[in-house]
C-alpha cells in the first residue's frame, strides 16, 4: 500500500530526494510544499524554486504558503491527509500545530552527522572547520532546531579540494537513498528512532554575504577552507582598493616550490603578480588565486584579471 507523502523542500539539493520518492513504487507524493517564488537575476523577476519547477513538470500539486505555520495553512495541509511529511532544505522552521498533522510525523533529511552542525549551513560549516568526515542524517522533526531522534545516517569523506557545492551534490544523492530507506523502515514498522547524544552539539547558522568576505589576517589553511566553504554560495569576496572582487577556490601549499622566496614575508592582503600567478598574503603563507569575478563580469583567470586591471603595485586586498 502506498504511503501518502507531502514533500517539503526548496533548493536544488532537495531534487534527488524528491525525484527518488516520486519514482518509488512504495510512496505517493500527493503534494509538494516549497517557499514562495523569489526574486532572481538582475531584473529581480520572481522565479519558482528548483523544487517547484520539478513538481510542476511532474504534475504534482504545489503548496507555496508565505506563512506555513498559520492556522489557515495548517488547516489546508490537514485536508490533504498526508500519512507522513518529508523535509529536505525547506527553509523555514515548523511549529507544533503543523508537526501534529501527519500521523507518522515529519522526517527531515539533514546534511550533517547530527548532533554536529545543526542549522541552515551544515555543509559549509563542516568544510570551514576542517572536518574530514561528514554525512547525512534522517530524523524525526521536533519544534526545536534539528534536535529530534535519529532514524539513520550515511557518511561521506570530505575531499581536500571539495567546495560546499561539490560536497552538497554528493550528499544530496546519498541522502536521497537514506531517506527512501528510512521511510520504508517507518512504513514497515521496523525502524525506531534513537535520541541524539547530548555531547557533540554544534551549530551552523546561515552564512551571510558579509561573512563570506575573506579575512586575510587568518592563517592560509583557514583562508583556503573558508573560501571553499562559501563556494558557490554566497561566494567568497574581497575588496581590492575600492573594487569588489569575487574569488574562486585558492591554492595553499607551504612547501610548494613555485612559491617565490620573496613572497614568504608578503603581508596579509598584500598582492604579488607575476607572469603566471597572482598571490595574496595571509596571516601565514601566501595563497594563489585561481579564478576571480570582478563586479558585473564573469569569472576569469586571475592572471588575466590582474594584468587587465593594471593593479597598483601597492594594491591590497581587504
Curated annotation (Swiss-Prot):
Signal peptide: none annotated. (6S)-5,6,7,8-tetrahydrofolate binds at residues 112-115. Pfam families: Formyl_trans_C, Formyl_trans_N. SUPFAM superfamilies: FMT C-terminal domain-like, Formyltransferase. Keywords: Protein biosynthesis, Transferase. It catalyses: L-methionyl-tRNA(fMet) + (6R)-10-formyltetrahydrofolate = N-formyl-L-methionyl-tRNA(fMet) + (6S)-5,6,7,8-tetrahydrofolate + H(+). It is an enzyme of class 2 (transferase). Its EC number is 2.1.2.9. One of its GO terms (molecular function) is methionyl-tRNA formyltransferase activity. Gene3D superfamilies: 3.40.50.12230. GO terms for cellular component: cytosol. Belongs to the Fmt family. NCBIfam families: fmt. Attaches a formyl group to the free amino group of methionyl-tRNA(fMet). The formyl group appears to play a dual role in the initiator identity of N-formylmethionyl-tRNA by promoting its recognition by IF2 and preventing the misappropriation of this tRNA by the elongation apparatus. This is Methionyl-tRNA formyltransferase. It comes from Mycobacterium leprae (strain TN). The gene is fmt.
